[in-house]
UniProtKB/Swiss-Prot annotation:
Protein name: LRP chaperone MESD
Signal peptide: 1-33
Organism of this sequence: Pongo abelii (Sumatran orangutan)
GO BP annotations, alphabetical order: phagocytosis; positive regulation of skeletal muscle acetylcholine-gated channel clustering; protein folding; protein localization to cell surface; Wnt signaling pathway
Region (Disordered) residue spans: 31-58, 71-93, 187-234
Region (Chaperone domain): 1-164
Length: 234
């Protein structure tokens, strides 16, 4: 009996010592959160937000991405879209005159940007070309045509239209001006009212060239005749 009692007491003492040792080894409550490094994210805490870039530091690529994001998020009106993203206007073939190819071009260029080259006659300076084409642009503006103008030479300018459907009407106006030598539209050159002087000068030059060639031929034939006569005398 004494031995069994002593054995039970020994077991109790060992269990108590093991429990005390376990309590000493365990960290106090809340110490895990305190010991966690502030720089390492916990599973329960959300990741830190990425710092936004200052808009003053944006480059061209950042602005392009921002514009693309706006286009995705916002409903942009059809007229504000870039030209290559606008849907093509439907062509009504019932209004096309087969005998007039220009009518087909007008329908296909509707709502599209179009450029035409205009040449001023009379060998003007760049300043004179600026003044003359400015008057033409003003007349078109008064007729409710939206036209932009760019000087590209001493006697040449570009007229740019946002709606190519009206290009041929503007061409008809320009070729009727006294100082318009010609208009180039869609690869086609249309002579203007002021282009006659160039044709006259060209005709005069051709006549003078032919006259010189004729004089040279007559001189050479005379020299040949003289040489032949000398040979016969010998």
């Amino acid at each position: 009996m004494a031995a069994s009692s002593w054995a039970r007491k020994a077991v109790v003492v060992l269990c108590a010592s093991d429990l005390l040792l376990l309590l000493l080894l365990l960290p106090p409550p809340g110490s895990c959160a305190a010991e966690a490094s502030p720089g390492t994210p916990d599973e329960s805490t959300p990741p830190p937000r990425k710092k936004k870039k200052d808009i003053r530091d944006y480059n061209d690529a950042d602005m392009a991405r921002l514009l693309e994001q706006w286009e995705k998020d916002d409903d942009i009106e059809e007229g504000d879209l870039p030209e290559h993203k606008r849907p093509s206007a439907p062509v009504d073939f019932s209004k096309i005159d087969p005998s007039k190819p220009e009518s087909i071009l007008k329908m296909t260029k509707k709502g599209k940007t179009l450029m035409m080259f205009v040449t001023v006659s009379g060998s003007p300076t760049e300043k004179e070309t600026e003044e003359i084409t400015s008057l033409w642009q003003g007349s078109l503006f008064n007729a409710n045509y939206d036209v932009q103008r760019f000087i590209v030479g001493s006697d040449r300018a570009i007229f740019m239209l946002r709606d190519g459907n009206y290009a041929w009407e503007i061409k008809d106006f320009l070729v009727g001006q006294d100082r318009c030598a010609d208009v180039t539209l869609e690869g086609q050159v249309y002579p203007g009212k002021g282009g006659g002087s160039k044709e006259k000068n060209k005709t005069k030059q051709d006549k003078g060239k032919k006259k010189k060639e004729g004089d040279l031929k007559s001189r050479s034939s005379k020299e040949d005749n003289r040489a032949r006569n000398k040979r016969e005398d010998l």
